């Protein structure tokens, strides 16, 4: 029995010593980890966990670089507003528009489609610049206003200068505003809105673009003083006859 007691005491002491050694090892590990956290600038106090100041500084520096260069704040989308006026005229020689009926009625109804293309002239009516091309979807026939509400998606083509695209409501009974959704050529990056004025439905319309986002000023030949909109407007004879003095370079036809 005495030898058994000695053995049990020996085992117990060995186990306690091992536990003590393990506890000291874990304490040393924790202290080492804590020092490592401190060296990194990271707090190990649970909810007080934080990034090192050097990391925060680098993050702020990166953000600053993204926003500025040479000390100047950059605006990736120029906000200067440039006005551009054009006339859209249907001269009844382009087999446009086409009416694709989906509604079961003689009048326009929801879902009817109207693809179209018309001629485009500068606001001063001195030059032919190109065409419009797009699609109108009938949203509603408005009998009390003797007109229609369309949802329109179309583009304005300006020969070598590029094109502008728009989307929004086209109301045949009152003025409306559409969103400028983009452009190409000199109109790359364009955004803003365009005012549509119905002069003679569906053959004469006047547009005033309020353009933002352009890298450069608009060409002078596109920005002549516009003729006041009226139902009696007509393009200059040179523009209508497509004479060299009456068109822009490589006008879109």
Curated annotation (Swiss-Prot):
Q: Which InterPro entries match?
A: Allene_ox_cyc, Allene_oxi_cyc_Dirigent, Allene_oxi_cyc_sf
Q: Where is the transit peptide, renumbered to this chain? A: 1-77
Write out the GO biological process terms: jasmonic acid biosynthetic process; response to cold
Which residue spans adopt a coiled-coil conformation according to this UniProt entry?
none
User: What is this protein's expression induced by?
Assistant: High local and systemic induction by wounding.
SUPFAM superfamilies associated with the record: Allene oxide cyclase-like
- A single Gene Ontology molecular function, please? allene-oxide cyclase activity
Question: Which subcellular locations apply to this protein?
Answer: Plastid, Chloroplast
Major site of localization recorded for this protein? plastid
Report the EC number(s), separated by commas if there are several.
5.3.99.6
Tell me the tissue specificity.
Highly expressed in fully developed leaves.
Give the Pfam families listed for this entry: Allene_ox_cyc
Record's catalysed reaction(s): (9Z,13S,15Z)-12,13-epoxyoctadeca-9,11,15-trienoate = (9S,13S,15Z)-12-oxophyto-10,15-dienoate
Single GO cellular component annotation? chloroplast
Q: What is the role of this chain?
A: Involved in the production of 12-oxo-phytodienoic acid (OPDA), a precursor of jasmonic acid.
**Would you tell me the protein name for this molecule?**
Allene oxide cyclase 2, chloroplastic
According to its UniProt entry, this protein's organism is: Arabidopsis thaliana (Mouse-ear cress)
Question: Gene behind this chain?
Answer: AOC2
